[in-house]
A protein has these predicted regions:
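Polytopic membrane enzymes that build or remodel cell-surface glycoconjugates and lipids
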Residues: 2-439
Length: 439
């Protein structure tokens, strides 16, 4: 009876977390456009590929720098069906993220946290800045997949009714995650830490071993490409010297209400204090929670610590942060609750700001891209040179014109450029993304 009650409680947790995230992230669902060039490029690729989206050369190209055949094939499939219906596309992405958050809440509940703390963990993860960025940009399907696979492995291991089932789930889902994104190489490390902090339970050790098998095979084939294949000057070029600064950025980003990676984070000292208070709250409960946060965090970030930081890279890290904080919550004193709540509230404000930015970019894209296609069509092969009325929005249009072969059947490519300095333009991009012809 107790097991049945816990099982029902887990399903209710899942439903509640998913519902809350779908509601709070509805501005991301009802975004009429897209954030960046990736979506436009893959919409074009989807029209060029003939036959099934999953039958392509991506699967055999194991030495491609970004070997993500599952991600790119799935993206192609969804683009074919939903690119012209942005609400549907965004709904799929947000729903997938909401499911991940719900699964995390179940995992935390099964690990021993109370119902309320488990529910809060799901929201802290699913409504945090990292998840908000992932939910708002359809290009981040890969992170949704590998984190989903990791959570399902964790849940199967915790349930552990049949050892052989845990072995199969760990082996198969780690393999699937690796086909989605190279970040999945961290899965065995996360499982090994779960083994250590769970009192060295055998199920976690077995899950670690079976998850490690595909990772070892994957790295034996792809390690050289991953380490040496990044073009010089690209954001994927790696440097060991940036590990400390990157690590700190990922810690502080949730409470830094600003664009990720900008020079000089606003009010750095208060941000560090808020983060430090949360860390102190964990320390006062027990040092093992601080160690768990640090070790799980480093493992979840793993290889991204050596490359240029980006908000979506912290998606897995935010999941383990939410889990550790929730497990410590019931043992905290009141001031600890205040410290963690302050961290969570500032993070939520950051998420609201991100939603505003992402939705604004989508609204502009929904007007800009069709207007640009029409302008190119009217130009009869002459270049379309654009100036931007509000230079603060220039980053949006740099993305929206970057390496876009075609839009809605109209060839773009070299026919479109943004004016530099005093260069003459024949169109000006207005505040709302529409185009105004210039004399």
């Amino acid at each position: 009876m107790r097991t049945l009650t816990a099982h029902g409680q887990a399903w209710r947790l899942l439903a509640a977390v998913v519902a809350c995230i779908l509601i709070f992230h509805s501005p991301l669902i009802f975004n009429p456009g897209y954030l960046s060039h990736d979506e436009l490029q893959w919409a074009y690729q989807a029209t060029q590929h003939q036959g099934s989206a999953f039958v392509n050369g991506l699967w055999s190209d194991v030495h491609a720098f970004q070997y993500r055949p599952l991600t790119f094939s799935l993206w192609m499939l969804i683009s074919r069906q939903c690119f012209d219906h942005p609400f549907a596309f965004h709904a799929i992405i947000v729903a997938a993220g909401a499911l991940n958050a719900g699964l995390l809440s179940i995992a935390v509940f099964r690990a021993g946290a109370g119902v309320r703390a488990s529910f809060a963990a799901g929201l802290l993860f699913g409504l945090g800045p990292y998840a908000t960025y992932v939910h708002g940009w359809v290009a981040i399907i890969a992170d949704l997949i590998w984190v989903f696979c990791t959570l399902v492995i964790a849940l199967a291991t915790m349930r552990n009714r049949h050892r052989w089932l845990t072995w199969i789930v760990s082996l198969v889902l780690t393999s699937i995650a690796l086909l989605a994104k190279e970040s999945a190489v961290v899965i065995p490390a996360l499982l090994a830490l779960a083994w250590f902090f769970s009192g060295r339970q055998r199920a976690w050790a077995e899950a670690t071993v079976f998850a490690a098998i595909p990772v070892i095979a994957y790295l034996s084939i792809r390690l050289q490409t991953i380490l040496m294949g990044a073009p010089s000057g690209s954001p994927y070029a790696w440097h060991l010297s940036i590990i400390p600064s990157n690590w700190l950025k990922y810690q502080l980003y949730p409470v830094a209400i600003d664009k990720f990676g900008t020079e000089g984070v606003r009010a750095l000292l208060p941000i560090v204090i808020v983060w430090g208070l949360m860390l102190l709250a964990l320390w006062r409960v027990h040092i093992r929670y601080v160690l768990a946060l640090l070790l799980f965090g480093i493992a979840a970030l793993g290889p991204v610590l050596i490359v240029h930081p980006a908000a979506w890279y912290g998606y897995g890290y935010s999941a383990v942060t939410a889990a550790v904080v929730a497990l410590a919550w019931t043992h905290m004193k009141r001031w600890g609750h205040v410290a963690v709540s302050l961290f969570a509230c500032i993070g939520f404000l950051h998420s609201v700001n991100l939603m505003r930015i992402i939705h604004d970019a989508g609204e502009k894209q929904s007007r800009f891209s069709p207007a640009l296609a029409e302008a190119v069509k009217k130009s009869h092969g002459s270049p379309v040179v654009l100036s931007v009325k509000n230079e603060k929005d220039r980053w949006i249009y740099i993305r929206m014109t970057h390496d876009i072969p075609s839009y809605d059947g109209v060839k773009m490519g070299e026919n479109v450029k943004l004016a530099e300095g005093s260069e003459a333009a024949n169109y000006q991009v207005q505040e709302d993304g529409s185009l105004k012809p210039l004399p």
